[in-house]
Each structure stands twice: as structure tokens, then as C-alpha cells.
């Protein structure tokens, strides 16, 4: 539980704020009009978001499970689960954590590529995101 909590704050909150600051500062540091690619910013955001959700959620669930296993006693007052059984039960969650970490790091690599191309002065020919052709929102409530 604690590991999931700390990593959701450190990677989720601090990491995302840091990424936003880098994206804001990169074009200004190298006197560029804009970032190389806003689409890559979106790719990075979704890779990092899905990665941190998998990472933190897996650690939250496995931490609670570990705590429940450590406080389970048999009729004689001995621990019901050995340490090895606890570690074995947590293994699938470590696999999910690793997958989340890989996605988060891949997002960071996408950001590094985008910042590198921005520093070089390259511009990507991108069409802007299309806006929805849906009807406008109803009038605000009074």
C-alpha cells in the first residue's frame, strides 16, 4: 500500500508537473515558436498516465493483500501464510507494476525525443486536432 501511495504521488503528481514544465520551457529555452510535435505530447501523456495507473494500482492492491496475509493467524496463533507464500501471491502484481513502469518510461522517451527535435529546430507538419462537429452545448442554467 505504501509503495503504491508514494509512487502515485512521486511519479503521478510530481512527474506530470515536471513534464508539463519541461514542455512549457523547452521551446523558450531554444527560442522556438513551438514544440516539435503536440501529438507526441499526447502520446506521452497517455503512456505515462496508463503506466502510472497500472503501477500504483497494482502496488495498492498487493500492499493491502500483503498486510491481510501477514495478519492472518491460525487457531494456534501462528501465521497462516509464510513469507514465501506472501511473495508468491504478490508476483502477478509485480508483473503489472513492471508493465506500468515500462509504459511510463516509454512515455519519458517519447518526451525526450520531442524535446530533442524541438532543440534542433525541427518542425513536424501536423494538422491540428479536429474539433467535434457535434451541436454546441445547451445554454447555461440560470
Language-model region placement:
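Short, highly charged, low-complexity non-transmembrane loops/tails of multi-pass membrane proteins
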Residues: 123-141
Amino acid at each position: 500500500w505504501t509503495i503504491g501511495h508514494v509512487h502515485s504521488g512521486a511519479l503521478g503528481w510530481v512527474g506530470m508537473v515536471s513534464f508539463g514544465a519541461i514542455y512549457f520551457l523547452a521551446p523558450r529555452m531554444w527560442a522556438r515558436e513551438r514544440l516539435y510535435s503536440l501529438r507526441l505530447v499526447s502520446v506521452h501523456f497517455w503512456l505515462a498516465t496508463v503506466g502510472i495507473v497500472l503501477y500504483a494500482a497494482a502496488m495498492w492492491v498487493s500492499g493491502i493483500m500483503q498486510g491481510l496475509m501477514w495478519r492472518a493467524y491460525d487457531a494456534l496463533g501462528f501465521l497462516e501464510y509464510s513469507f514465501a507464500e506472501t511473495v508468491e501471491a504478490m508476483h502477478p502484481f509485480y508483473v503489472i507494476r513492471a508493465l506500468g513502469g515500462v509504459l511510463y518510461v516509454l512515455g519519458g522517451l517519447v518526451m525526450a525525443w520531442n524535446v530533442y527535435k524541438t532543440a534542433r529546430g525541427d518542425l513536424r507538419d501536423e494538422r491540428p486536432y479536429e474539433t467535434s462537429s457535434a451541436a454546441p452545448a445547451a445554454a447555461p442554467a440560470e
